[in-house]
Amino acid sequence: MAKYEIMLVVRGDLDQEQANKVANELKATLKNTEVKENNYDGVQQLAYEINKLKTAYRYVYNFETTDVSLINEFRRLAIINKNVLRHIIINLEKDYGYKATVNTKKVQRNEKRAEVYARQKEEAERRAVERQAAYEAMKAEREAAGLPVKEFVKNTNSKR
């Protein structure tokens, strides 16, 4: 079952009974779901005006469902209803924000990537040490033969 969270913002100029009625009508579309949590935040001041309104009722529903058509129906009814100022539906199973740090598949994938990057870094450092040792040996040979010695180029990634 997929986990979802819905936030519903209802007009603040309605009285509480009307706002609850609007929210309950929309919640009724989620009939075959396991509602885990209902939060009613009451009338709150909006950060900015929406349709010339400064206050709104906020409802948050957390639930689980396998039927995506219920989510689509909820979205359709929320858009049609003029008393709903805003709504957002979030699939909590997907990796948004901090959820990516909790998702075991993503955590395992990131750990594997970190291991690969650590091995690549160790290999690059080992090759750099080998290059430095080869340079020192070449330098000693050339000095013994009386030939000029070139400077060691540390950045071997640059194209010459």
Curated annotation (Swiss-Prot):
Taxonomic superkingdom: Bacteria
Entries under InterPro entries matching the protein: Ribosomal_bS6, Ribosomal_bS6_sf, Ribosomal_S6_plastid/chlpt, Transl_elong_EF1B/ribsomal_bS6
UniProt record, GO biological process: translation
GO cellular component: ribonucleoprotein complex; ribosome
Coiled coil: none
GO molecular function annotations of the record: rRNA binding; structural constituent of ribosome
Keywords carried by this UniProt record: Ribonucleoprotein, Ribosomal protein, RNA-binding, rRNA-binding
Similarity annotation: Belongs to the bacterial ribosomal protein bS6 family.
Function of the molecule: Binds together with bS18 to 16S ribosomal RNA.
HAMAP family associated with the record: Ribosomal_bS6
Protein known as: Small ribosomal subunit protein bS6
Organism, as annotated: Ureaplasma parvum serovar 3 (strain ATCC 700970)
